[in-house]
Amino acid sequence: MSSDLKSRFLQVYDTLKSELINDPAFEFDDDSRQWVEKMLDYNVPGGKLNRGLSVIDSYQLLKGGELTDNEIFLAAALGWCIEWLQAYFLVLDDIMDESHTRRGQPCWFRLPKVGMIAANDGIILRNNVPRILKKHFRGKPYYVDLLDLFNEVEFQTASGQMIDLITTLVGEKDLSKYSLSIHRRIVQYKTAYYSFYLPVACALLMFGEDLEKHEEVKNVLVEMGTYFQVQDDYLDCFGAPEVIGKIGTDIEDFKCSWLVVKALELSNEEQKKILHENYGKKDPSSVAKVKELYHTLNLQGVFEDYENTSYKKLITSIEGHPSKAVQAVLKSFLGKIYKRQK
């Protein structure tokens, strides 16, 4: 991804933001316009923008040539719709998880003037997506498919978040509920569909493809999303906070993390007892005991094995795809995340 394309992508953000804060469906005054602008700037463009940029990347690989200015704009607008969706999830997620930082700064709801207004801001972020789609895609033959796609992926993500929340109910900390299959279900729905399938599906629709003919592409991307989340779980504990932009709290939050699931699988009775007694507790000594056990069980080595095996499996699946252009899209995705540090 050239820095030129990234700067063009960011220019499209400014255009979309300006359209949204001048949306004729609502009479903005100075206060509301300033609020929304500040809220958007704080929550939408601050991440790595991988999901959004991937739409342009994927479309370019499918087309196989130079993109027109209009194609770049439309692919970027779809990319920003995904970033908006992500911002909406994260703003509400941070409230539910009582998080403190996100992307190296305080969570939006932690700002003194924001608080629980953040819940409504999340709803506004979510409602910005169909406004953008309507303005720029209403005349396109794939408009209805786009709306269906965003609605379905949002439903899948919210349902994944639900399984995550009800499985990690802090009131009844029951580690025996945690297994690789539960972890996989949470990850698939909560992360893989919107982070991996959605950007490629947007590019395929824009390219005139029928998504029903690309089930195997969806399957590979969901596998990739699972691999990505396992990396995330690993980095939450073993990554450097200054590199990943947040302080990991999966242990304190009793998260159904790949690490704890693997630890349960590899532990003897004595070690299981340590997990049951310390996992999900806020005090630093409990967290330290869990981390120490992770080291004892060599979860770093177990993760490296997992990473290598997953990579080989994914490459094999990708190379089985009949279209070289689709292979290129999938390989470009995999290349971005393989052995990442943040």
Swiss-Prot record:
Class of this enzyme: transferase
Pathway: Isoprenoid biosynthesis; farnesyl diphosphate biosynthesis; farnesyl diphosphate from geranyl diphosphate and isopentenyl diphosphate: step 1/1; Isoprenoid biosynthesis; geranyl diphosphate biosynthesis; geranyl diphosphate from dimethylallyl diphosphate and isopentenyl diphosphate: step 1/1
Obligatory cofactor(s): Mg(2+)
Gene Ontology biological process: cholesterol biosynthetic process; farnesyl diphosphate biosynthetic process; geranyl diphosphate biosynthetic process
Positions with a binding annotation for dimethylallyl diphosphate: 102, 190-191, 229, 246, 255
Annotated positions binding Mg(2+) 2: 93, 97
Cofactor note: Binds 2 Mg(2+) ions per subunit.
SUPFAM superfamilies xref list: Terpenoid synthases
GO molecular function annotation: (2E,6E)-farnesyl diphosphate synthase activity; dimethylallyltranstransferase activity; metal ion binding
GO CC annotation: cytoplasm
Record-linked InterPro entries: FPS1-like, Isoprenoid_synthase_dom_sf, Polyprenyl_synt, Polyprenyl_synt_CS
Keywords: Cholesterol biosynthesis, Cholesterol metabolism, Cytoplasm, Isoprene biosynthesis, Lipid biosynthesis, Lipid metabolism, Magnesium, Metal-binding, Steroid biosynthesis, Steroid metabolism, Sterol biosynthesis, Sterol metabolism, Transferase
Chemical reaction(s) catalysed: isopentenyl diphosphate + dimethylallyl diphosphate = (2E)-geranyl diphosphate + diphosphate; isopentenyl diphosphate + (2E)-geranyl diphosphate = (2E,6E)-farnesyl diphosphate + diphosphate
Positions with a binding annotation for Mg(2+) 1: 93, 97
Compartment list: Cytoplasm
Amino acids binding isopentenyl diphosphate: 48, 51, 86, 103
EC number: 2.5.1.10, 2.5.1.1
The family this protein is said to belong to: Belongs to the FPP/GGPP synthase family.
Function: Catalyzes the sequential condensation of isopentenyl pyrophosphate with the allylic pyrophosphates, dimethylallyl pyrophosphate, and then with the resultant geranylpyrophosphate to the ultimate product farnesyl pyrophosphate.
Name of the protein described by the UniProt record: Farnesyl pyrophosphate synthase 1
